[in-house]
């Protein structure tokens, strides 16, 4: 039980840290003054981690509800 709670808290903390980490980065220059404006997707890992965090938080909430009902 304590392990599950600790794991959920760890996942939530990691989500918060990851979101704070991603706010300071600038996209690369990419030659925009020369007309080279290609669409590049930079945040694939962020979306994957946010999906994992969402799954973890939903799972934790479901576990807490089942524990409260017992």
Curated annotation (Swiss-Prot):
Belongs to the FARP (FMRFamide related peptide) family. This is Neuropeptide SIFamide. Ligand for the neuropeptide SIFamide receptor. Expressed in antennal lobe (AL) and gnathal ganglion (GNG) with expression detected in most animals (at protein level). Not expressed in corpora cardiaca (CC) and corpora allata (CA) (at protein level). Keywords: Amidation, Cleavage on pair of basic residues, Neuropeptide, Secreted, Signal. GO terms for biological process: neuropeptide signaling pathway. Residues 38-70 form a propeptide. It is found in: Secreted. It comes from the Eukaryota. One of its GO terms (cellular component) is extracellular region. The modification Phenylalanine amide is found at residue 34. Residues 1-22 form the signal peptide.
